[in-house]
Design a protein with these regions (language model features):
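Short, small-residue-biased leader/transition segments that mark boundaries at the very start
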Residues: 1-7
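C-terminal helix of von Willebrand factor
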Residues: 8-37
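A generic structural signal for short, solvent-exposed coil/turn residues
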Residues: 26-28, 40, 110-112
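Acidic/polar loop patches that form or flank catalytic/metal-binding clefts of enzymes
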Residues: 26-33, 44-46, 89-94
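Soluble, acidic/polar mature domains that operate outside membranes
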Residues: 36-50
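Long, acidic serine/threonine- and proline-rich intrinsically disordered regions
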Residues: 43, 51-78, 83-211
Length: 211
């Protein structure tokens, strides 16, 4: 397990060697893998934002010999999927000619309230055999609007959206930077160590350089 840090000022040094130092020293999970299966009756299209260099073949999820990411104490992992609900027009993918994407009633019976199914594998530090956790992604967990979503979700969307815009993502044409900035400000929260304020300053600096 290793970590790469970029230290550009005193505040960053305090973060790396102070508040975040123990997070890199104490591993809590090795070879963490995440897999999501979407219900094709409810989701017609989906895509994972980022993680292009961390993608695994489907069959490698259950293969404990395939390495994956390690997680330290205090770290968290966020995966953002963009989905298109079934029946919504203007998708990016043409309808299938053979083998329609909509599942048969027999296959979907009992899963009408599930957008998908999440599976997570990890190894305890020093062990060779992985452990499996799983849970359905329920319709009842959805929110009618982004503004009604939990603060952590709104923050993650703001950061992910800005990352897409900054790198010139093919799907970022309609992203409004000012709207993302306001979204991040509203989801800033307590911000004990000032990291979120630093992100807001970064948005401001990049926008000034662009203009």
């Amino acid at each position: 397990m290793g970590s790469e840090m970029c230290i550009r000022d005193r505040n960053e040094a305090q973060k790396v060697f102070g508040s975040d130092f123990s997070k890199s020293l104490v591993p809590i999970a090795d070879d963490l893998k995440l897999q999501v299966e979407f219900n094709r009756e409810l989701v017609s299209e989906y895509r994972l934002l980022g993680y292009e260099t961390r993608a695994l073949a489907r069959q490698d999820f259950n293969n404990d010999k395939v390495d994956a990411g390690d997680i330290g104490s205090g770290h968290s992992v966020t995966a953002i999927y963009e989905i298109l609900p079934a029946g919504v027009a203007n998708g990016f993918v043409d309808p299938l000619r053979y083998g329609q994407a909509v599942a048969t009633p027999t296959r979907s019976k009992g899963f009408e309230e599930e957008y998908g199914f999440l599976k997570l594998r990890y190894k305890r530090p020093g062990e060779d055999e992985s452990n499996l956790m799983s849970a359905p992604i329920l319709k009842e967990a959805a929110h009618s609007s982004l503004s009604s979503a939990p603060r952590e979700t709104r923050w993650a969307v703001a950061v992910g959206g800005y990352g897409m815009a900054l790198r010139g993502d093919d799907y970022a044409d309609n992203i409004d930077i000012a709207e993302l900035s306001n979204l991040a400000k509203g989801a800033k929260g307590r911000d004990k160590y000032g990291y979120r304020s630093e992100f807001l300053d970064l948005i401001k600096t990049v926008n000034e350089l662009k203009n």
